Structures are given as structure tokens and as C-alpha cells.
């Protein structure tokens, strides 16, 4: 696979979308966005594609809505054959391009690995995943090996003030009002 983008060294990236099939003969690709507002994917630049274990940088030359989706033209990809090589590759961005948040806000990715503790001090485990259920998100908490309640995993609804009492980014800790037996 030829790499027309620029290689980068930083390995921490955030996947924000995926390329679909080529569109036309001039190097355009269909884009499937994972961002809340689909068009927001184009607010982030540059994009990175993991090609054979190396993050390769690409810049969007142009994009447009097409039918119910979106298509993009990347700099340096001028023919269908070159663009076809990126079909089904995930689109990632550098975390540094994300907007800075206020002290009481956070990105979901920051919650992974945080310790989850009840208001009474019981250590429930660490956040291993977050499920989007539609009504509210749910923390998947991997329990400690010697959990007194025999739990391996807990599903805790992310309901601020009702269940989630405090998220402390600095201490890497989430305080919850939750029964450890659940």
C-alpha cells in the first residue's frame, strides 16, 4: 500500500470515523462519522490512518454532503485507485485537537481506567468500557479480583447527581451512590 500522507510518531489517537467506498474517479471517499454531529468530523484536522502499524497523516482537501452521507477528498489522493486503498480504514485524530474542557467536564475516553468507589468508600473496580443505551450511558466496571460480593463486573448507569456523585480527573476516581451488591 502506498502511503501518500505524512508519517507521525505519537501513537495516542482517537477514532472518529471510517472510510467507505470510493466515490467518482478523482479520489473521493465516502465518510462515516462517529461524532455526535456527523459533520463535526471535518472540524478536526489533520486525520490519521493506521497503515501497517504506523499513523499516517492526511489533510482533507474538500468535503460535501452526498445523498444521506458525506464524501471527502484528501490531499494527495487524486485518482480512484489511490483512494480505494483507504476503503474501510478508520479515521483518527490527535487528542490535542479536541477543545479544552472546563474543570467539571470530561471526555468519555478520560473515564477509562478510573477507580470507581461508593460514597461509603467501597472500591467497586475500574471503568473498562462505556455502553451507549440511548436513554443514558452505562459504565462497565471491572471488579477487583477479591470482590467481597463476588462480582466480576458491574453495570452502573451514568446519571449525574443521582448515581454519579463526583468525577475527579486529577485523582482518577469516580464516586458513586451505588449498592456494591448490584
Curated annotation (Swiss-Prot):
Complex formation: Binds ribosomal protein uS19.
UniProt keyword Disulfide bond, yes or no: no
Gene source species: Vibrio campbellii (strain ATCC BAA-1116)
HAMAP family xref list: Ribosome_mat_RimM
GO biological process per UniProt: ribosomal small subunit biogenesis; rRNA processing
Location of the protein in the cell: Cytoplasm
Written domain comment of the UniProt record: The PRC barrel domain binds ribosomal protein uS19.
Gene3D superfamilies, per database record: PRC-barrel domain, RimM
Superkingdom as given in the UniProt entry: Bacteria
Family: Belongs to the RimM family.
Name the record gives this protein: Ribosome maturation factor RimM
Role summary: An accessory protein needed during the final step in the assembly of 30S ribosomal subunit, possibly for assembly of the head region. Essential for efficient processing of 16S rRNA. May be needed both before and after RbfA during the maturation of 16S rRNA. It has affinity for free ribosomal 30S subunits but not for 70S ribosomes.
UniProt-recorded Gene Ontology molecular function terms: ribosome binding
Keywords assigned by UniProt, alphabetized: Chaperone, Cytoplasm, Ribosome biogenesis, rRNA processing
UniProt xrefs under InterPro entries: PRC-brl_dom (IPR027275), PRC_barrel-like_sf (IPR011033), RimM (IPR011961), RimM_N (IPR002676), RimM_N_sf (IPR036976), Transl_B-barrel_sf (IPR009000)
Chief location category: cytoplasm
Domain PRC barrel: 103-182
A Pfam family of this chain: RimM
